[in-house]
A protein has these predicted regions:
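The two-metal-ion catalytic cores of nucleic-acid processing enzymes
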Residues: 1-493, 497-504, 508-509, 513-647
Length: 650
């Protein structure tokens, strides 16, 4: 069994995981040969000292399970008792090979490799008797870390970054990534309440003299005082500046004639200050541009971005091009050998609010205005082209760049999105890049809680199934005003299900978990789908669905189940089981009791029956049954009527 042990930290130590990065790369040997190596980089924080440390797991191990004694299962199990399984441990990079070897699929495994069908080997996870083998290695070690250490949410130090590009010599309408110089970088660090700006003073640029004048001005106390007052006014006055702690900020301006030195010093400062989280709004632009610009200047981005104190160097930046314009779905992430975790602030904002109503725009200016009441600096009285601004008014250009990170800070102060995503990642044992993805974090949460109860979750086999062409019909509709303030149902676990007053809950969504628990609904409790091919009665509702979707077709079996759950048992049996309706049932009852009555010639009057959808309650009718003596427990006509009403109409 694999354990996540960290040297110097015994079980129960108060440390919290910050990030995980699994790296697999090809290494060239001195003799000209090459081989793949893999390792897991774990960044964590000591909550007692506040210091951050790392742990590197070379060729990390992984434990999966199979049914004991070579047992085979006839179908997929959602979960199974851990006592019925045998654990198997192997290097994670050899996981599929190990499963194939132990299940006599070795030749098939190599055939897939020869055919470049590497994804085909992942179907080994669908073997019914194989469990717990399809977890992402980063999530797997997050779970192991949480089992051994406290892993509680901790205080996080945040920083913000924004760059500006000098696009005057661009070839197209907008600079290509890395094409033009970076002429300003704003870096705001929360922990020491300091805003840093790195400014490029290009001697060949037409605005060089303007920059020199600004340099002299901004390095004076008068310049700093004017900047502070300007920032206070821009965010909305002293109250708002105090609310977002903008009034506490100090400002430092650093000027460089060499662009490469400027970028290098930025990362050196980041290493020195070591924020826990670095937030960039639309990181796909800023970080990609920095990386490509370093390369354009003739340097290796690893030498700039990675921390020299860490023995391994890696920098992976994934941009989700498939969801490029769907910000709430974007899966951009950074893996870097650093003591700082990089996050896209825009994606975190959009992902957290997915489904709550679409924002008109996710631009920094629009979100800053709507969330925090703070906007970017408006330079429209000078120019409409940001590329021209540093040549027309360099002071406003510089302050515009500084103001961007201040807007970022105000948004985060208002939303606390970083605390949300990191806490969600911790409690669900899920990597930060997938913390908002329900299909990922819910599966990890299931694994965590089921394992605590002695069960091991099965693998997700649905990813290999074809998408269903039709939907399961069904709905639950109710009037919340009919519910009291008392618990509707008390579950065996002792948990109560409430419906609260003064709560807007469209489509009764809050009841879904309660309904699921009450009825024991889960993949492992499903036994099939009911089909009724031929018409059973003449009252079928072909228009029972309001959806125009092709998949929402009429289901005879669905209507039958809905009728059965309505509680109108007599009408259900009449329609679907060809039994008597209410009139016929009463006729049979009267005929039975008449035949068994002690007194002959009993006079009976029957309430006229009206066959309607959703039978109306039976009205009181004094002359309905007269002079009947029964040899049954219903010797009293009122008692009989009461029982009929009780059992026939719910």
């Amino acid at each position: 069994m694999v354990k996540c042990t960290i040297e110097g930290y015994p079980k129960g130590s108060d440390i919290t995981i910050l990030n995980t990065s699994y790296i697999r790369e090809k290494k060239d040997d001195d003799d000209g040969s090459s081989a793949y190596v893999d390792y897991l980089f774990i960044l964590f924080k000591d909550n007692k000292t506040g210091e951050k440390h790392y742990c590197i797991k070379n060729s990390p191990s992984y434990t999966y399970y199979m049914v004991k004694n070579g047992g085979k299962l006839k179908h997929h199990f959602m979960f199974i008792e851990e006592d019925e399984l045998e654990p198997y441990t192997c290097p994670y990079s050899k996981l599929l090979y190990d499963i194939a070897t132990k299940n006599n699929f070795k030749e098939w495994f190599y055939n897939n490799i020869r055919m470049n069908n590497f994804a085909g080997n992942r179907q080994l996870h669908t073997l019914n008797h194989v469990f717990y083998s399809d977890i992402d290695i980063e999530d797997y070690y997050r779970a192991l870390f949480a089992e051994r250490y406290t892993n509680e949410p901790c205080k996080l130090n945040k920083a913000y970054l924004d760059i500006e590009v000098d696009g005057r010599n661009r070839m197209g309408e907008f600079p290509e990534s890395g094409e033009c110089p970076i002429n300003a970088i704003s870096f705001l660090n929360d922990e020491n309440n300091t805003s840093y700006q790195f400014i490029l003073e290009d001697k060949t640029a037409p605005n060089y003299n303007m920059i020199q004048e600004y340099k002299k001005y901004i390095n004076s106390q008068n310049g700093i005082n004017e900047l502070k007052q300007f920032i206070t006014n821009t965010v909305g006055g002293y109250k708002k500046a105090n609310k977002y702690e903008i009034d506490k900020l100090q400002y430092k301006f650093l000027f460089y004639e060499d662009e490469a030195a400027m970028i290098y010093d930025l990362f050196q400062l980041m290493r020195e200050l070591s924020p826990d989280i670095l937030l960039i709004w639309n990181m796909a632009f800023d970080l990609s541009y920095i990386r490509d610009r370093i390369d354009k200047l003739g340097y290796n981005p690893l030498d700039f971005i990675c921390d020299d104190s860490i023995p391994v160097k890696f920098f992976r930046f994934y941009v989700d091009e498939r969801n490029k314009n769907e910000f709430a779905e974007r899966g951009d992430f950074v893996s870097v050998s650093s003591y700082t975790v990089w996050l896209d602030q825009m994606i975190q904002f959009a992902s957290r609010r997915k489904g709550r109503g679409q924002y008109v725009s996710f631009k920094l200016d629009d979100i800053g205005k709507e969330i925090a009441g703070v906007r970017k600096l408006d330079y429209s009285n000078i120019t409409t082209d940001i590329m021209q601004l540093p040549y027309l008014n360099f002071k406003i250009f510089s302050w515009y760049n500084v103001m961007d990170t201040i807007v970022q800070k105000c948004i985060e102060a208002k939303t606390q999105d970083v605390e949300y995503v990191t806490t969600k990642s911790l409690i669900n044992n899920t990597r930060l890049s997938k913390a908002h993805r329900q299909s990922v974090y819910l599966a990890n949460r299931f694994r965590k809680e089921f394992k605590q109860k002695g069960f091991i979750m099965g693998n997700n086999v649905n990813i290999w199934n074809e998408k269903p062409t039709e939907k399961y019909p069904g709905a639950m509709v109710g009037d919340p005003t009919h519910n009291s303030g008392e618990p509707m149902i008390k579950l065996p676990t002792g948990q109560s299900i409430f419906v609260a007053d003064n709560v807007i809950d469209y489509d009764y969504k809050s009841l879904y978990p309660s309904i699921t628990i009450e009825n024991n609904m889960a993949p492992n409790t499903q036994r099939g789908k009911l089909y009724i091919d031929t018409q059973v009665h003449d009252k079928e509702h072909w228009d029972m669905y309001t959806s125009d979707e092709e998949t929402a077709k009429y289901s005879r079996a669905g209507e039958m189940l809905e009728n059965m759950m309505s509680g109108n048992h007599i009408e259900f049996c009449h329609r679907w089981l060809n039994l008597g309706n209410i009139k016929e049932v009463l006729d049979d009852m009267i005929e039975l009791y008449r035949a068994t009555s002690i007194k002959p010639n009993v006079g009976v009057k029957i309430l006229p029956f009206k066959n309607v959808h959703g039978i109306e309650p039976m009205l009181e009718y004094d002359g309905m049954i007269k002079g009947v003596t029964f040899d049954t427990e219903y010797s009293d006509k009122d008692k009989l009527l009461s029982e009929v009403r009780k059992k026939a109409f719910i």
